[in-house]
Amino acid sequence: MAFPTSSAQQAETNRKILEEIQTKKQLLIGLGSTANQMPAPQLLGQPTVTAEFVQNVSATPNAAGGIAAPRSAFNPTSSTTLGFFIPQDSYFGNSFIPVLPRLEPVPTPPAPNSK
């Protein structure tokens, strides 16, 4: 790799590097905003969540006595899991309990006898 010999070449190299970083930053910011607009993937066998349940979860009081705002955690979680959630009152700030389905273990085939 050749190094610039004069301060003018050094300044030009620094300017190009900064421009490249700025364009990459703008690209990443643009990708981040479109990723937030994409819907979450839906899984097969996912239970439906009623509006009443969402209201119960969002109105659960937290340890400070105020209304917790679990909706920011509840929505992405409920859209990406096979389980469901039960609202609860908690002094620790846990506004809902996850309930996951019990899956039966896959039977393993018997090992062949080697003689």
UniProtKB/Swiss-Prot annotation:
Pfam families documented for this protein: SOSSC (PF15925)
InterPro entries per the UniProt record, alphabetical: SOSSC (IPR031821)
Gene Ontology CC terms: nucleoplasm; SOSS complex
An individual GO BP term: DNA repair
Similarity comment: Belongs to the SOSS-C family.
PANTHER family: SOSS COMPLEX SUBUNIT C (PTHR31526:SF2)
Protein name per its UniProtKB record: SOSS complex subunit C homolog
Annotated organism of origin: Drosophila mojavensis
